[in-house]
Amino acid sequence: MSTGNILVVDDEPDIRQIVQEILEDENYAITTAENAVAARAAYNTHRPDLVLLDIWMPDTDGITLLKEWASTGQLTMPVVMMSGHGTIETAVEATR
């Protein structure tokens, strides 16, 4: 039995895979997306309980996607922003 649905959004396949494996070992149902287009589709299909969202992605960055979800009333779940290239400024922007 799943303990919750988590959407993992990251353009790096290795990151998606390792996060998915770790969370599936804890009985979470995981959906992955490699970019904002796939994340939008996965959100609409699976309605996740939590989103792990990469800040830096090539098409649309995670902060833009987060703001989009907030402005359209779709931000109904917690979102954890992730980045291997973060800065203080980026972290502050993600919290706005």
Task: Specify the residue positions occupied by each region the protein language model found.
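The short loop immediately C-terminal to the conserved phospho-acceptor aspartate in CheY-like receiver
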Residues: 12, 29, 55-56, 80-81
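Alpha4 helix (beta4-alpha4-beta5 surface) of REC/receiver domains from two-component response regulators
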Residues: 17, 64, 86-96
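Short amphipathic alpha-helix used as the core "switch/output" element in two-component signaling
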Residues: 41, 63-75, 93
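Acidic catalytic/metal-coordinating carboxylates
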Residues: 4, 34-38, 61-64
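The feature encodes the CheY-like receiver
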Residues: 16, 58, 72, 83, ...
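Active-site beta3 strand of CheY-like receiver
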Residues: 46-52, 57
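Two-component/phosphorelay signaling modules centered on CheY-like receiver
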Residues: 13-31
